[in-house]
């Protein structure tokens, strides 16, 4: 399970260094192989390959009225491998789709990660907190 937020920088080639606390798990779970794709909220999803295969099967099984969402998730997917330094290359098309420049946030979301432009994430987080908790969380015990 992946959790926690990491403020990271992309290098000049568009590579993101995976924090050391997640590298070993990605090596064990997926031999360093990951898949990146677009998310409708404006970030990227980063899956260990076995988790991606499960997600891909669920998306592929969606009915025809979700055909555009299949295109968005599956058509934009890029399989990549961590290099020896624990970096992942994010393709220019995916960097552009998520408006990733230099400063990014990597968020552990359980079985996968989200990759956000740092400024976009900060603005969306502030907006969500200003709106208050959704009904589903109002009776949640912290």
UniProtKB/Swiss-Prot annotation:
Origin superkingdom: Bacteria
Output the GO biological process annotations, alphabetical, semicolon-separated.
negative regulation of DNA-templated transcription initiation
InterPro entries for this protein: MraZ, MraZ_C, MraZ_dom, MraZ_N, MraZ_sf, SpoVT-AbrB_dom, SpoVT-AbrB_sf
Give me the disulphide-bonded residues. none
Query: Where would you say this protein principally sits, based on its record?
Result: cytoplasm
Q: Where is this protein localized, as stated in its record?
A: Cytoplasm, Nucleoid
One Pfam family this sequence matches:
MraZ
* Coiled coil ranges: none
Q: Would you tell me the Gene Ontology cellular component terms?
A: cytoplasm; nucleoid
Sequence ranges assigned to domain SpoVT-AbrB in this UniProt record:
5-51, 77-120
Any keyword Transmembrane? no
Give UniProt keywords alphabetically: Cytoplasm, DNA-binding, Repeat, Transcription, Transcription regulation
Look up keyword Manganese and say if it applies: no
Q: Which GO terms describe its molecular function?
A: DNA-binding transcription factor activity; transcription cis-regulatory region binding
Query: Per its UniProt record, what PANTHER family does this chain match?
Result: TRANSCRIPTIONAL REGULATOR MRAZ
> Its family?
Belongs to the MraZ family.
Subunit details: Forms oligomers.
Please name the NCBIfam families in this protein's record. division/cell wall cluster transcriptional repressor MraZ
**Which named protein is this?**
Transcriptional regulator MraZ
What is the name of the gene encoding this protein? Answer: mraZ
